[in-house]
Swiss-Prot record:
Part of the 30S ribosomal subunit. Contacts proteins S4 and S8. With S4 and S12 plays an important role in translational accuracy. Located at the back of the 30S subunit body where it stabilizes the conformation of the head with respect to the body. The N-terminal domain interacts with the head of the 30S subunit; the C-terminal domain interacts with the body and contacts protein S4. The interaction surface between S4 and S5 is involved in control of translational fidelity. The keyword RNA-binding applies. Residues 15-78 form the S5 DRBM domain. This is Small ribosomal subunit protein uS5.
Length: 172
């Protein structure tokens, strides 16, 4: 599942919303069919902050505004290494699996659909991606966000491992 992160105040950031998809849904009731809409929105400031939100309503504009408000409530801070991700990672959400690989400067975002929208909102400029498993846009977007939040600083990991090895060697 997605990792727990600290709360980020959206009022301090200049956020831009991107609509990933709108889905028309129908509920069959005794009197006929009731139409509704579901929207998936990604919001980010292009400087390491990104969030995903889903909104449902009877009309499209209200579904989009609900999704945008939900995305602002679910903001995450992402660790970057310059314009790319610090290391390769494969993250799974439901049946959707997303591979994120660092790329050389000037490569661009090699991604499609909801993966591209999430990465552009984050501010990542160079990355290689592969989406595997299901093609459900919501699950692919959540897998991408999960992979980004699971990123760790390689230098911090090395120092943490070294300190734990020293403690083990000294018998502490």
């Amino acid at each position: 599942m997605l990792a727990k992160v600290e709360r980020i105040d959206p009022s301090e950031l200049e956020l831009n919303d991107k609509l990933i998809f709108i889905n028309r849904v129908t509920k069959v009731v005794k009197g006929g069919k009731r139409m509704g809409f579901a929207a998936l929105v990604v919001t980010g400031d292009g400087k390491n902050h990104v969030g995903i939100g889903v909104g449902k309503a009877k009309e499209v504009p209200s579904a989009i505004s609900k999704a945008s408000a939900n995305a602002k409530r679910n903001l995450s801070r992402i660790l970057l290494n310059g314009t790319t991700v610090p290391h390769e990672i494969v993250f799974k959400y439901g049946a959707a699996q997303v591979l994120l690989k660092p790329a050389a400067p000037g490569t661009g975002i090699i991604a499609g659909g909801s993966v591209r929208a999430v990465l552009e909102s984050t501010g990542i400029k160079d990355v290689l991606t592969k989406s595997m498993g299901c093609s459900n846009k919501a699950n692919v977007a959540k897998a991408t966000l999960g992979g980004l939040t699971a990123m760790r600083d390689p230098k911090a990991t090395v120092t943490k491992r070294r300190s734990s090895l020293k403690e083990e060697a000294t018998g502490g």
